[in-house]
Amino acid sequence: MTDLYIDADACPVKAEAERVAVRHGVRMFLVSNGGIRPPAHPLVESIFVPEGPDVADMWIADRARTGDVVVTSDIPLAAKVVAAGALVVKPNGETLTQANIGNALATRDLMADLRSADPFRQGGGRPFSKADRSRFLDALERAMRKAQEAGRSASGGNEAGS
């Protein structure tokens, strides 16, 4: 059975992900250290983890498997769940896979080095846009279909047994 995990702290697409999860009839876990509204649908569950570095990430990484989808911007978390067989969609609609996660990790590390070398650099990435939201919805829809197919294959086509 497919589950959808949301790295919910500062995630701009929680409502969109919830609509997709409900439409597909899959459980969705909003994982954060607090500060998000309680879910309105019984398929959606808020998971509150203790504060601390990477606590929410580890909760997700310990559970995500083949047939699941994870929404996160956290590249190290994405690498862990991709290695476990889950599909990853970033809030901007970019998908992370076995084929591109190594490059994403290298780019993340390079950018961290560049930021630390220039302490006067200010600003961040570009603002989240309507186009990003649209790309996310399209990518999540495709990932959900692919994950559900992978989940059926992994369980031998018998979801009643999962």
UniProtKB/Swiss-Prot annotation:
HAMAP family: UPF0178. Pfam families: DUF188. InterPro entries: UPF0178. NCBIfam families: PRK00124.1. It comes from Cereibacter sphaeroides (strain ATCC 17023 / DSM 158 / JCM 6121 / CCUG 31486 / LMG 2827 / NBRC 12203 / NCIMB 8253 / ATH 2.4.1.) (Rhodobacter sphaeroides). Belongs to the UPF0178 family. This is UPF0178 protein RHOS4_24670.
